[in-house]
């Protein structure tokens, strides 16, 4: 399997840092939002959009594009930051996050936001839609792949497992799902709220190929995605061991930052921390 070049790896790391900066800035400006679970997926978002996926900001609806569905729709700040970084719309728009009548709503809206393939927010519906897209691709003999990111708390939704059963039954080998396994949800530790563990075994039971990785290691993520592309017997689930709030020490591993915005002073400090400014 092909490894990342140094240039590719550097690009992904630089874009992940830029995505994290934009997440903090946009949520701070909005005075509301979900920074913790947005920061935890910045690395995989950067890798997908700047290396792995076949997408074109100048033609966002092209038929042969790869599809992406953010099933954990509350992490919209990460998706918007990535889309802006990729060139779907100006980065200056990010400060309008969650403003009434703006195209960057609190959860992804496919009718108004360039580059968004599916409206999400109600947990469990995103992965279900991703399964439908993947099946449509099979029926049409299309070459595109479908990627979806789920939260670990989202796995408490029964609809997720209906979708998992569906994907395994139809052997949707053009579908790759990522689980953002940071161990925390809005009410605290996922094992105490409603444990979805063991996550790998559950997906394996539904005939998925399962790979576990460090969700902040670009090389591990890339190799897992390459393996998913090569696997022909069904869908792949990449379980990413991540840190909620990754990149901001005060947020890391803290459930309290699931849906809380930084103050203006904190926002400046957090951005400086991400950028390495003393």
Predicted segments — roles?
Residues 90-109:
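Anionic-ligand anchoring segments at beta-strand to alpha-helix junctions in alpha/beta enzyme folds, i.e.
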Residues 80-89:
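Alpha-helical support elements that line or immediately flank enzyme active sites
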Residues 42-47, 77-81, 127-135:
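Contiguous, well-ordered alpha-helical segments that form the cores/surfaces of helical PPI scaffolds
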Residues 5, 9-12, 16, 20, ...:
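Generic structural signal for well-ordered, non-membrane alpha-helical segments
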Residues 55-67, 103, 107-278:
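Glycine-rich ThDP/TPP pyrophosphate-binding loop and its adjacent helix/strand module
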Residues 2-76:
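N-terminal amphipathic, basic-rich helices that act as targeting or association modules
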Residues 35, 94, 237:
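Flexible, glycine/charged-enriched surface loops at secondary-structure junctions
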């Amino acid at each position: 399997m092909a490894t990342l070049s140094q240039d590719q790896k550097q690009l992904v790391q630089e874009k992940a840092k830029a995505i994290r900066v934009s997440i903090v800035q946009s949520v701070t400006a909005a005075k509301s939002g979900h920074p913790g679970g947005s920061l935890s997926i910045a690395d995989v978002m950067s890798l997908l959009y700047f290396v792995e996926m076949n997408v074109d900001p100048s033609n966002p609806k092209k038929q042969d594009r790869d599809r992406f569905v953010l099933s954990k729709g509350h992490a919209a700040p990460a998706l918007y930051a990535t889309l802006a970084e990729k060139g779907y719309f100006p980065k200056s728009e990010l400060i309008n996050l969650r403003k009434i009548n703006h195209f960057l709503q609190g959860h992804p809206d496919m009718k108004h936001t360039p580059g968004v393939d599916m409206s999400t927010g109600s947990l469990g519906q995103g992965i279900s839609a991703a399964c439908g897209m993947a099946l449509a691709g099979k029926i049409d003999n299309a070459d595109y792949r479908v990627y979806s990111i789920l939260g670990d708390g989202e796995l408490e939704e029964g609809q997720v497992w209906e979708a998992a059963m569906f994907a395994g039954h139809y052997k949707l080998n053009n579908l790759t799902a990522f689980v953002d396994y940071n161990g925390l949800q809005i009410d605290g530790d996922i094992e105490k709220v409603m444990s979805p563990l063991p996550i790998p075994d559950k997906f394996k039971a539904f005939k998925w190929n399962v790979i576990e990785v460090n969700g902040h290691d670009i090389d591990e993520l890339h190799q897992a995605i390459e393996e998913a592309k090569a696997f022909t017997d069904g869908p792949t689930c990449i379980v990413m061991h991540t840190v909620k709030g990754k990149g901001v020490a005060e947020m890391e591993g803290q459930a309290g930052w699931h849906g809380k915005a930084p103050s203006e002073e904190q926002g400046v400090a957090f951005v400086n921390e991400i950028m390495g400014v003393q």
